[in-house]
Amino acid sequence: MPSELRSPRLAVLIDADNASAKIVDGLFEEIAKIGEASVRRIYGDFSNPRSKGWADTLSKHAIIPQQQFAYTTGKNASDITLVIDAMDLLHSGRFDGFCLVSSDSDFTRLAARIREQGIDVFGFGEQKTPESFRQACRRFVYTENLLAGAANSQDAASTSKPLQPSSAATPIIMKVITQMESEDGWVPLGEVGKQLANLASDFDPRTFGFRKLSDLVRRTNSFEIDHPKGGSMRIRTKSAAGSPPKSKTVTKTAT
């Protein structure tokens, strides 16, 4: 019998000093959409009261703590240990992807190095995370979007305040549509979603208060929407819809 397709095997490495324990339920729900969290480790000084929140969640999610005492002020042994473990796991050849949970730009080079090896990196951090780390990941998820109540409606905006207004998504969606170079301006929404992920690793409809890209597009009121019979939803910019066809310039010959 043919073997069943296996979910991507993931290594989840959490920086306890730069991630809140409040995200843990949403974090593993999000990771489950990507693959199987085969390794779950968290790094920090759990003798510190700041890490107590994480200590209370470890058993529920089968997270293995990697205790690192802060012997010297200003030296982060936890970060170093996380990087060493990540490289050991990378060279084991057993993983299809890594989930790095931190808002610390110090992990930018680690993410880039893992991707150089042809392995996907999924980052999870707060909106304040430096762009260098966000863009080093194949995909970056803002942890504010993982909290209970964040964009929890299936079809409309959440009652909680979004991280950014829906209008802020318009320029990047327009940019993608332009890059796709459709003759009549119409592009499939599914393809737009794929290109958005390639262009901006941290693009997420939930950041703007919506679970689905289609709902976000409708709310911006900047796009024409079409549902072809038997086809998928497609969109184009309203400016493209109202633009007259280009006319040829006729040069008069002097007589």
Indicate residue ranges for each PLM-predicted region.
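Domain-level signal for Mg2+-assisted phosphodiester chemistry and nucleotide/NA-binding surfaces
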Residues: 1-91, 120
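Short, structured coil segments at secondary-structure junctions
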Residues: 61, 117, 135-137
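Short, well-ordered beta-strand core segments
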Residues: 65, 98, 139-141
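P-loop/Walker A NTP-binding module and the surrounding RecA-like catalytic core of P-loop NTPases
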Residues: 21, 40, 108-112, 117-122, ...
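Acidic beta-strand-to-loop metal/phosphate-binding motif
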Residues: 13, 43, 96-103, 110, ...
